[in-house]
Amino acid sequence: MAKINGNEIRPGYVIEHDGGLWVAVRTNTVKPGKGGAYNQVELKNLINGTKLNERFRSAETVEQIRLDLKDFSFLYEQDDALVFMDTQSYEQLELNKDFVGDRAAFLQDGMMVTVQLYEERPIGISLPDQVTLTITEADPVVKGQTAAASYKPAVLKNGIRVLVPPFIGAGERIIVDTNEITYVRRAD
């Protein structure tokens, strides 16, 4: 752990604040006409996801946390647990489905993920930014709606609904952004 000044906090930094671990989502340096400058920081709690806005003056110091990043391979799902394997030591890690959240639906056998660890305890997980999935259902194209960019709903193999362009049909493979849960492009 390293101490840093409040004005050195940048987006992506993980800090210890009020007894919890927080990641800086957004920062903004404010220089008011009267008084000293400060750093307005939007923080997100790594454990429960709550958000908090804090002001840090340059004279304040905070603990910057160094997270260990480990690569894991997704193995299988068992009840409410997701099982991953460390690619270095072959040890298995079991995480609750709630820990991964809605993005658990994107996990596929053998998919590589990065788990963020603090003192050997998992506190976050990063999935690949894009995955390739097959469309199981797509509404038919309605003729005459081509004047404006129109999208139609489609259901993916994992049950997630996304909006796709009219030329995409059932059975096609598309690339989906796992962060925004949006259509990116047709897969090759």
Swiss-Prot record:
Domain of life of the organism encoding this protein: Bacteria
Keywords for the protein's UniProt record, in alphabetical order: Cytoplasm, Elongation factor, Protein biosynthesis
BP-aspect Gene Ontology terms: peptide biosynthetic process
Gene Ontology terms: cellular component: cytoplasm
Gene3D superfamilies: 2.30.30.30, Nucleic acid-binding proteins (2.40.50.140)
GO molecular function terms listed in the Swiss-Prot or TrEMBL record: translation elongation factor activity
Chief localization: cytoplasm
Disulfide-bond pairs as recorded: none
Pathway(s) it belongs to: Protein biosynthesis; polypeptide chain elongation
Compartmental location: Cytoplasm
Stretches assigned to coiled coil: none
Keyword Kinase: no
HAMAP family, per the entry: EF_P
Role: Involved in peptide bond synthesis. Stimulates efficient translation and peptide-bond synthesis on native or reconstituted 70S ribosomes in vitro. Probably functions indirectly by altering the affinity of the ribosome for aminoacyl-tRNA, thus increasing their reactivity as acceptors for peptidyl transferase.
Annotated PANTHER family: ELONGATION FACTOR P, TRANSLATION ELONGATION FACTOR KOW-LIKE DOMAIN-CONTAINING PROTEIN
Alphabetized NCBIfam families for the sequence: efp, PRK00529.1
Record family assignment: Belongs to the elongation factor P family.
Protein's name according to its UniProt entry: Elongation factor P 1
Naturally occurring in which organism (per UniProt): Mesorhizobium japonicum (strain LMG 29417 / CECT 9101 / MAFF 303099)
